Amino acid sequence: MQFRPFVYDAMNRQVPVTIEPMTPQDAALTDREPLWQTSWTSEYLANEDYEKYAAKVGDELIALAAYEVLPTALVVHIVYMEAQPESNPTLDGGTPKYRGIGRLLIAYGIKLSIDSGLTG
């Protein structure tokens, strides 16, 4: 089975997404306008035990997620996930640029669990 991540745009079309390890530049974008709910440069999210990933449509950062692989518990813990302000239900005024970001990040957590030899 192949993992083909996507979200839906405002016209309800599937848009392919790439998911890669978060870079310091990705984290810094959360401190610029339009501000994200959370600064991903914060001490809490800087925890080295967390695997952090960036979801992008082309070069556009649409979401960030932090996961904690807990092999002794046989799970991947989703520590935190957040959509860009334009697609964040608490910030977008009811008209998100992209939909399905939460489901995408949960699905990626399941993939990360399977890839880590856990049970998904």
Annotate each predicted stretch with a short phrase:
Residues 1-97, 104, 108-120:
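Non-catalytic substrate-recognition and accessory regions of acyl/acetyltransferase enzymes
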